[in-house]
A protein has these predicted regions:
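Feature of Fe-S/electron-transfer and energy-metabolism proteins
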Residues: 1-240
Length: 242
């Protein structure tokens, strides 16, 4: 279906856009607000101007990706205006780490990698460890050849991912985090770096976040890009160069 182009403010969705289509898109849609119907999704009965009208998507609600394409991923102010870091603020100001874990357990949230392991159980196991030095690691490498899920979030809404790591860190009382991302994702790496720097400038990352006494430092590790075949320790071992 790609390359896909969404035209704001009309919300038109164009499919399989080629370079030679750009002039028509500019003249009809950008200048006159008219749709280019031949580039839209259609079946035997209807042309669908927006993604939301397409039957497959009509009953769906975007959650994780809802800001992607609607905010400038390199400006933290736009992310904050869209609600970024509000959940972290609620967690750190209104809830104990134990309450955060219970909330995640009660939500039924599970991993999306296929195994469906309950996220709250994973967090509670980490929080229950005797060792007080803990880490939060985000697997942005994806592992599966050709996978594209995590890249979409890292490139389109990096602050959402960072906030999730911060909530996890507060819940398990970790003060260091690592994002393991493919070196083949240069745009994702760049936007994550910018997002981390901007969050640090706003006092949302680093020491004594928002004056709460909780500290969390985030680092990026660029992986070589390999299929780890589901071996759970491979990624973490590569972080410490074993």
């Amino acid at each position: 279906m790609g390359p896909l182009v969404r035209i704001e403010p009309y919300n038109y969705l164009y499919l399989k856009v080629k370079l030679e289509d750009c002039e028509e898109i500019f003249e009809k849609t950008i200048l006159r607000g008219e749709p280019v119907e031949r580039l839209m999704y259609h079946d035997d009965h209807k042309v669908y101007e927006t993604q939301e009208e397409i039957p497959f998507y009509a009953e769906q609600t975007r959650l994780v990706l809802k800001n992607c394409g609607h905010i400038d991923a390199e400006h933290i102010e736009e992310a904050i205006a869209a609600g970024a870091y509000e959940s972290f603020e609620k967690a750190v100001f209104e809830m104990t780490p134990e309450a955060v874990i219970k909330s995640v357990l009660d939500s039924g949230l599970r991993g999306r990698g296929g195994a469906g392991f309950p996220t709250g159980r994973k967090w509670s196991q980490v929080a229950g460890q005797k060792e007080k030095v803990r880490y939060v690691v985000c697997n942005g490498d994806e592992g599966d050849p050709g996978a594209f899920m995590d890249r979409s979030v890292m490139e389109g809404d990096p602050h959402r991912m960072i906030e999730g790591m911060m909530i996890a860190a507060y819940a398990v009382q970790a003060h260091e985090g690592y994002i393991y991302v493919r070196a083949e994702y240069p745009l994702a790496v760049r936007r994550l770096k910018i997002a981390i720097e901007q969050a640090e400038e706003k006092g949302l990352l680093g020491d004594n976040i928002l004056g709460t006494g909780f500290s969390f430092h985030l680092h990026i590790n660029r992986g070589a890009g390999a299929f780890v075949c589901g071996e759970g320790s491979a990624l973490t071992l590569s972080l410490i160069h074993i």
